[in-house]
């Protein structure tokens, strides 16, 4: 019986690794197809764009790249860990896969006549990957999250400035206080953009909020269920006040 248990565990982990590998392959294929449909075909000449000040989004796009680098790293690492990898290896593979995927997105943009390679986008991608990797190996009470202003306007692949402006990108901190890990509320500082009355000029916004995520809320009464819902920790349900930055 003692020898059968390790064999059974190895077989289970092998099956899980195949499941994760297959899901990732299908997922990245769908992302590629949707990106090409939304932002245009990558059939032009290689070129670089001024993405820091030239996209009319006042760095909200860079904030989104920070979020996706961070969230992808944590999510993919968790999936490889479920597949049976050691904590260290799952973190390494998750971070490498995230960095590679986000780099390939920028390479696609570099050959897209309507886009272009964004150097600042890449820098924020890699910063997000690094932040995600750091928090996996050094767990704490701060995280990077997102929320939307109007749910009806939400699009994962934003096609217009209006859709991009709908997102708020947050850095949140959850003080444990007297309740410890079951304390569900987080304080957040968020960044977003809206349009001036002319409908064109971007206006930067800072948001100061208090809120929670679904896993943090569920953890107050069902810690085991909260671990299962951990993949949903990226969304910040909040109340906030907004300050315009001129």
Residue ranges, per PLM feature:
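Glycine- and acidic-residue-rich phosphate-binding/metal-coordinating active-site segment common to enzymes
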Residues: 119-166
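Interfacial helix-loop-helix junctions of multi-pass membrane proteins
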Residues: 104-126
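Transmembrane beta-barrel strands of outer-membrane/channel proteins
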Residues: 148-150, 187-193
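Outer-envelope beta-barrel architecture signal
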Residues: 92, 140-144, 181-185, 206
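Residues that define the transmembrane beta-barrel architecture of outer-membrane proteins
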Residues: 163-169, 202-206
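Sequence/structural signature of outer-membrane beta-barrel proteins
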Residues: 108-113, 153-155, 194-198
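Residues on the lipid-exposed face of transmembrane beta-strands in outer-membrane beta-barrel proteins
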Residues: 130-134, 169-177, 208-214, 237-243
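N-terminal targeting leaders of membrane proteins
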Residues: 1-62, 66-87, 182, 201-207, ...
